[in-house]
């Protein structure tokens, strides 16, 4: 497993960090959002090109793990989800390969959707039957097979938008946002897409990379957009006091640019993710 390089600093804030990734450059973590790189980890899968990554706690131990999406397998033409688990010191070990979804055409999303501490995988298949979701859960739960989306251009995101400890499905299409909160009171706590809890709201443009992170430590993920050309990240904070719509995310149909900060200079990420540090778990001393 490939090693990482790190800076030494003291982490003392409650907000999430951000990771900027590209296949060639690997993962660049900015834990305290000061525009400086705190940890560098190479892309773990080196034998094949990786299409995208997800960074979250996929085994319930409190440390962020890596999930690298491999669409290159010509033999079975399926998506191979390659999980690498953090040992607590940012060494990524015990790789696990999950095969789910078609390599060509299916959109990919990975998160803990039912709050059981295990990472789950989901694909969305856009065809004549609609914007169709298929979800597979690592633990005992019935799979999801339901339609939900804005358009076939949707960018798939997952974040805790209602502070219940499990990931909700969030979609972004050229500045438009849509979200359905995962029910946390049902037996299996799996997405049912019955409600559009965030819908018809605007924040960002078609040129931005969307991401979700809890910027202010209130337990709710906030919406953010990364402008790679400007090397900036702008955040729309959840604030029910000033944003009465969409469960505290918009006013008059729009989010607001509440916070803007710089990303580390010189990076050209193709994927940007928020990183939760539930144990203060940067792995740094």
Can you annotate each of these PLM segments?
Residues 1-7:
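Bacterial N-terminal signal peptides
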Residues 13-285:
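Trp/Gly-enriched beta-strand/coil motifs that build multi-repeat beta-propeller-like domains
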């Amino acid at each position: 497993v490939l090693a990482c390089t790190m800076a030494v600093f003291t982490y003392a804030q409650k907000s999430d960090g951000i990771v900027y990734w590209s296949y060639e450059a690997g993962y660049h973590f900015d834990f305290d959002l000061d525009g400086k790189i705190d940890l560098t980890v190479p892309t773990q899968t080196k034998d094949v090109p990786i299409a995208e990554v997800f960074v979250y706690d996929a085994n319930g131990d409190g440390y962020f793990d890596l999930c690298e999406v491999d669409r290159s397998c010509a033999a079975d033409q399926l998506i191979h989800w390659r999980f690498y688990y953090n040992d607590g010191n940012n060494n990524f070990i015990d790789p696990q390969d999950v095969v789910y979804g078609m390599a060509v055409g299916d959109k990919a999303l990975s998160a803990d959707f039912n709050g059981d501490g295990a990472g789950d995988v989901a694909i969305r298949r856009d065809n004549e039957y609609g914007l169709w979701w298929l979800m597979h859960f690592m633990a005992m739960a019935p799979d999801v097979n339901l339609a939900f989306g804005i358009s076939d251009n949707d960018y798939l995101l997952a974040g805790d938008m209602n502070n219940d400890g499990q990931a909700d499905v969030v979609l972004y299409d050229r500045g438009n946002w849509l979200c359905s909160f995962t029910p946390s009171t049902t037996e299996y706590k799996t997405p049912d897409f019955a409600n559009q809890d965030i819908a018809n709201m605007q924040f960002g443009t078609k040129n931005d990379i969307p991401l979700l992170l809890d910027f202010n430590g209130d337990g709710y993920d906030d919406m953010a957009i990364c402008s790679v050309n400007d090397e900036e990240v702008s955040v729309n904070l959840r604030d029910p006091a000033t944003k009465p719509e969409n469960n505290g995310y918009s006013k008059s149909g729009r989010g607001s640019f509440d916070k803007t900060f710089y990303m580390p200079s010189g990076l050209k990420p193709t994927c940007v993710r928020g990183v939760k540090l539930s144990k203060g778990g940067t792995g740094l001393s």
